[in-house]
């Protein structure tokens, strides 16, 4: 009995007090147990299953990842679940883990190591792709490099942009020129990133009379530039293609370079054909890209390397590159080059060149094979060096234009020609699906071109990971 209850003379009252205290304690204990149980149920209900308890072992976690990667085991796989990335791919993947470990170094060692990695990779890429005295910006989003280059061009043309901001552009609006054959959404992306209105974009049409219909019309571009200057606008930057997104054609970069120098316009080049700059033989149109102001490349797909960043090479301007965001002192930004730094050393120059050469040879072999097949039309710009092959089945109509498209003839009504075109497109769509199932590693794609209709594209440089064997 508690000492406080012992002081009560009346034993009956003391007993009642004791019983009351015990009863209250029982009620409190019961309430506490109920609250604890409800709390556990609440936690169990709110916390996802994998996080409950004291954690899981690594084997179980990796098993879960494997199941997620493979999907439902009962499904019949339509294509290989996991791409074989090869040993050089494992080196690139290692770069990401190694980068996380490097970040644990002390500040001075980290600075020296990241600077060395960035400078080495920049030098190697400039030498391989014949780009003299250039700097490199590594980025995950392929279009990000061009957005940074646009900022650099704005700062170089508008000296007071740092102080005045966008109000400094009002009196002389900048103009960015894009080819009609540019990849979809590029113009909108640039305007969103730069905060520019859509009228700052100028779409340059492709040739209609002479040359490739997927190649920028240089004469029309010059007319657009003159018109913009007369209206008080500032021609800022031109994006040229060394391999258009659709058919892999290259603009007349040499002529465009002369035009840009004449009017003080920044020339940026992008496209899959830039990979051929690493080869011994390079077409003159692509070789001219080595003299441009900047160019964006994607060595990851070209070499079959996973998780390797895109690279934009540009002419260095110490006063402006920092403010344009092309240079960063953050170790994490410099370490973006690490996977490529490791992979280039693993492959060596011979291995690097051999992969690009092999992809180009695959295109040449396909071209030679298609020439032997009746009713196959090939849309290739340069049969000797083009790494992209676009083709389609097409049975020419009597009196039709043999240059890859059907045109009305006197004996056929427009509706008959339309039905013929529709049937041909449907057949090419079926042909593409069949070829993709027969040779899934080919990376063959089916696309619709405005003038030609449904076509099949073979671009081994963009599917190099599947072409290793």
From Swiss-Prot:
Belongs to the group II decarboxylase family. Residues 28-47 are annotated as: Disordered. Residues 28-44 have a biased composition (Basic and acidic residues). Residues 12-40 form a coiled coil. Keywords: Coiled coil, Decarboxylase, Lyase, Pyridoxal phosphate. This is Putative pyridoxal-dependent decarboxylase domain-containing protein 2. GO terms for cellular component: intracellular membrane-bounded organelle. The gene is PDXDC2P. It comes from the Eukaryota. Its EC number is 4.1.1.-.
